[in-house]
Amino acid sequence: MRIAACLLALALVGCAAEKRPERKLDDLFAARRADDAARALEARQFIDAILKRTEGKAQAAAKAGPGAAPPTIDLLVISGGGDWGAFGAGVLKGWGRVKGGRPQFDVVTGVSTGALIAPFAFLGDDASIERVVQLYRAPGDDIATSRGLLFFLPNNPSFYVLPGLERALGTALDRPMIERIAAAQGNGRGLLVNTTNVDLGDMHAWDLIAEAKLALASNDEDRVRRILLASAGIPAVFPSRTIGDYLYVDGAITGNILYGGRTKEGEGLAAQWRAKHPQAPMPLLRYWIIFNNQFRFPPQVTQERWPDIMGRATIMATQTSTMNSMRHLFAMAQIAKLKYDVDIDVRVLAVPDEWVPPKPGTFVPEVMNELADLGEKMGADPASWRSDPP
């Protein structure tokens, strides 16, 4: 009995996460104020860059004459959804078969599994899209592995570790790919992924182009992958990630789609355009939302066991929050049309409500491949996109 107790004690010590140093509350409040100011400055700089790119497109269209195609600003918004990100990866591949192909997106944003997809969507060529499709089609047996029989102990940093995902992401998003992302700095395009800073208690949207350049300069390209893994780090289930002085987890906690919902009145792209160009028409603004989920889940009998209840309720809470964010975006678009006389389209593509996974569980290859197939089929059909709020 004593031997068993000693072994258990050793196991507990071995599983414990290293304790992080405490900080005074006043210091944390000051750090949050500084972080808020930094995020606000980044947001203004981002809007300025997109505005400049929009002006360039409008000028090019004016020079081309009346027969030229009207200019557009295309924003791709990729939601979270765990292993259902296979659907979004498939959508991007199928979209490439549409006449004219995928747009070159001016802005790509991603959250959680959408953050893993976003860099490949931003690069946009067929080879990059195929890389992310294979990331989901061939997950591997060790994509997520339990920490063992004592995974639930409170000193553990998470229930699971992600050796397979970390390895696959390192292969797919290698240094040459990161160099291509960094090379986009200065052309007005944007690549943003959302995380949650659990220390400061707020979202943190990362400019992945700037981060790619910083990572290359410091010879630490793994920094980019840490940001993506943080965005996909379901709290307690998957490992959190320390970046700089702070701890980051799943971006879906503070926003499962990243669409500018916190932009203050008068500071958005449409408002800035109208203030600077009172009489000039603004290029069409198109939001493309890939929702790696369903608007309504299939009904089921949920057993009175805490894992079943918590799992179902957590997924429903995230889904409902995301749908409310989408409704907010549709409302923002309507207000901008009325107030600033600009054209804004919002289009959404989601897993059909009637679709049922062929097998239970997460990271099941049969499920992920069926979702990828479904995404390819729907992505290749322009009629799959809906233009009304969910």
Regions found by a protein language model. Name each.
Residues 1-7:
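Sec-dependent signal peptide recognition
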